[in-house]
A protein has these predicted regions:
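Conserved phosphate-donor/acceptor-positioning beta-strand/loop module used by diverse small-molecule
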Residues: 44-68, 126
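Acidic, metal-coordinating catalytic cores used for nucleic-acid/nucleotide bond scission
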Residues: 35-36, 114-118
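Glycine-rich phosphate-binding loop used to anchor ATP phosphates in small-molecule kinases
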Residues: 11-45
Length: 182
């Protein structure tokens, strides 16, 4: 019943707004790229019915290798084991298929590799999906001075680079579980 109560929904929205203020972020639009957001798409839609979900997919082996190398902490222990990564990734794919069947109009799939190859085309798709006006500065995101709180802050301040595409190939001899299961 908590989610049926409009007062509770307002309070939850307000709490999230307070959380965002911790990052000195005052813009009308925000991007929350927390790695586990995919688990909460139904809840996100309930709290923020106008929210758009940009689902950036990537080659599963490259994606899992990236997670493995990042040494995440706090609830992301599945990233420390190839077997756990494979299981988690398959569960993630299943859950995303469910969310897309429930909320097809709020989820846009963008392939990471396509974004790297033709970033202008893919960024324009995102802008259109979000009902925003195109601004050529979107191509120069790395020059934006807005606050960023993410493990990849240094990457976000650089132009798009291609070195992560097919990065798994260099390590495939050490990650046989990922290679065989994904």
């Amino acid at each position: 019943k908590i989610i049926d109560d409009q007062a509770n929904l307002r309070k939850l929205r307000s709490n999230y707004g307070d959380f965002i203020k911790n990052f000195n972020y005052t813009e009308k639009y925000i991007t929350d790229k927390a790695p586990l957001n995919f688990r909460w798409i139904g809840f996100i839609n309930l709290l923020f019915p106008n929210a758009k979900i940009i689902h950036c997919t990537r080659d599963p082996k490259n994606n899992c290798l990236s997670m493995f190398k990042n040494l995440f902490e706090g609830g992301l222990n599945f990233t420390y084991s190839q077997e756990d990564l494979v299981e988690y990734y398959k569960n993630y794919q299943e859950l995303m298929n469910f969310w897309k069947s429930q909320y097809p109009d709020i989820i846009l799939d963008i392939k990471y590799e396509n974004l790297i190859r033709n970033n202008e085309l893919e960024i324009k798709k995102i802008i259109k999906f979000c009902n925003l006006e195109w601004d050529k500065n979107c191509l120069f995101f790395h020059k934006n001075k807005a606050p960023i709180k993410t493990m990849s802050t240094s990457q976000a301040r650089k132009p798009i680079y291609k070195s992560s595409v097919n990065s798994f190939d260099k390590f495939k001899d050490y990650f046989k579980v990922l290679e065989n299961e994904l």
